[in-house]
């Protein structure tokens, strides 16, 4: 009997021959088939997975590196096994032979391409309600969104359909679904992970990211992706200095989210963490100047460049015409036909607002001698599928996209690393995540801090799949 657990624990069991790789894969396949209603996957190849598992067992390699571990790759990432459709009809036949850099590193270490994760169409959205491929459902409550755009990966990891996964994060798309699904999501410093072989949104902001059961799994996968052994940084909570920029990040939270944040802060304070309540000057102003101007201007340009250079048999205009999700089509067509964001606005975002946003973060960390910043990943918990444009938040109707990405957006625009950790359940049993952000290129230390916080919180809740 195989009990599914984390990647690190699974590798240990495989090395100790507690079960074979084939037995592990059979257990995972059965679980995936039983949970097909979550619509987490666009493509699987169980025959190939079984064959590969048998070969690994025959050669006695199970548990060495990542050998035997199936991962879910978001459908905009080339794996060499599945089509890199980015969840849009126009790319349904796009199947690159060469895996993306981030996939190549993991597959070379022995990981198996377990599934292609369903996603928000072309990554431009946070609900994963894809009108072309169907909505991904949250394993905690199938009537709710899992977050996005890497919703399929997060749902698969939370439901233990796959042991871990790789998504992409432009402004929220790894950390938000991780938070709404009760798992760990890591967005590295921009440039830490390779971005080749990935259908893009905004090259300035895009990065692959890891979704996993726990922080040790993230540390393991991060080291493999970066091509170096994980750095053994042991961090004691006592003496850590963590910033609380309350005016922006703690404003207008759902009551359950606010309570969870207060509880976690008290737990860590009892561990002698020093909290510094101070705001980042002009954060909202600088972030607003970067966020949408950069993403909206770069989206059609980067997508067209990718299609022209890496996709055969279909043109950019054909891909655009085939888009099914109204929210994605409206944004893309508005930029293409009406020049929603002008070149001058884009240049202002890149040359003025983004450097000032980055400088504001740098000065904030330095002035207060901070190790990290702590805040709720999202101001609210998962909401019903279908509320793509507006959602009720604290009694008022608000823009769905803007409220869900509000807290995770600024550090994305600054290119900083962020780690979302599951910390609590709401009164109606939905996961709540807290994020820690670090300064640029502090990824290893941020992960070490996350590990220490994870151990202090000891979140053990899992969804029950029907």
Curated annotation (Swiss-Prot):
GO biological process, one term: auxin biosynthetic process
Active site: 74 (charge relay system), 149 (charge relay system), 173 (acyl-ester intermediate)
GO molecular function, one term: hydrolase activity
Name of the top EC class for this enzyme: hydrolase
Pfam families: Amidase (PF01425)
Entries under SUPFAM superfamilies matching the protein: Amidase signature (AS) enzymes (SSF75304)
InterPro entries documented for this protein: Amidase, Amidase_CS, Amidase_dom, AS_sf
Coiled coil spans: none
Pathway it works in: Plant hormone metabolism; auxin biosynthesis
Keywords, comma-separated and alphabetical: Auxin biosynthesis, Hydrolase, Plasmid
Entry EC no(s): 3.5.1.-
Gene3D superfamilies: Amidase signature (AS) domain
Entry function: Hydrolyzes indole-3-acetamide (IAM) into indole-3-acetic acid (IAA).
Protein family per UniProt: Belongs to the amidase family.
Official protein name in the record: Indoleacetamide hydrolase
Source organism of this protein record: Rhizobium rhizogenes (Agrobacterium rhizogenes)
Organismal lineage: Bacteria, Pseudomonadati, Pseudomonadota, Alphaproteobacteria, Hyphomicrobiales
Gene this chain is encoded by: aux2
């Amino acid at each position: 009997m195989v009990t599914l657990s984390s990647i690190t624990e699974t590798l240990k069991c495989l090395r100790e021959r507690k079960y074979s790789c084939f037995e592990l894969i059979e257990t995972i396949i059965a679980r995936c088939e039983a949970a097909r209603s979550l619509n987490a996957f666009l493509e699987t190849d169980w025959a190939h997975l079984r064959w590969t598992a048998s070969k690994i067992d025959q050669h006695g390699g199970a548990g060495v590196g990542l050998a035997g571990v199936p991962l879910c790759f978001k459908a905009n990432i080339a794996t060499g096994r599945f089509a890199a459709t980015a969840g849009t009809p126009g790319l349904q036949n796009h199947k690159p032979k060469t895996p993306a850099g981030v996939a190549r590193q993991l597959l070379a270490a022995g990981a198996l391409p377990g599934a292609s994760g369903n996603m928000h169409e072309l990554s431009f959205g946070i609900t994963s309600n894809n009108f072309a491929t169907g909505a991904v459902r949250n394993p905690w409550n199938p009537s709710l969104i899992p977050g996005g755009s890497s919703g399929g990966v997060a749902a698969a990891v939370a439901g233990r359909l796959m042991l871990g996964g790789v998504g992409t994060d432009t402004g929220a798309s790894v950390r938000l679904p991780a938070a709404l699904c009760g798992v760990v999501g890591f967005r590295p410093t921009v440039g830490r992970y390779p971005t080749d072989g990935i259908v893009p949104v905004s090259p300035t902001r895009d990065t692959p990211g890891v979704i996993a059961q726990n922080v040790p799994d993230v540390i393991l996968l991060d080291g493999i992706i970066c091509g170096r052994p994980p750095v053994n940084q042991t961090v004691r909570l006592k003496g850590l200095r963590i910033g609380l920029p309350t005016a922006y990040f703690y404003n207008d939270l759902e009551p359950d989210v606010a309570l969870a944040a207060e509880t976690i802060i008290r737990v860590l304070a009892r561990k002698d963490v020093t909290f510094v309540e101070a705001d980042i000057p002009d954060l909202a102003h600088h972030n607003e100047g970067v966020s949408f101007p950069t993403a909206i201007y770069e989206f059609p340009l980067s997508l067209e460049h990718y299609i022209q250079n890496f996709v055969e048999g279909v043109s950019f205009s054909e891909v655009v015409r085939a888009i099914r999700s109204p929210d994605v089509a409206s944004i893309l067509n508005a930029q293409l036909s009406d020049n929603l964001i002008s070149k001058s606005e884009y240049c202002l975002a890149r040359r003025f607002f983004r450097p000032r946003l980055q400088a504001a973060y740098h000065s904030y960390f330095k002035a207060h001698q901070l190790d990290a910043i702590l805040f709720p990943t999202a101001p609210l918990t998962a909401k019903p599928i279908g509320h793509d444009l507006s959602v009720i938040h604290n009694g008022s109707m608000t823009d769905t996209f803007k409220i869900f990405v509000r807290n995770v957006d600024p550090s994305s625009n600054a290119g900083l690393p962020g780690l979302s950790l599951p910390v609590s359940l709401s009164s109606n049993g939905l996961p709540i995540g807290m994020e820690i952000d670090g300064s640029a290129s502090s990824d290893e230390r941020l992960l070490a801090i996350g590990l220490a916080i994870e151990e202090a919180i000891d979140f053990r809740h899992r969804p029950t799949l029907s």
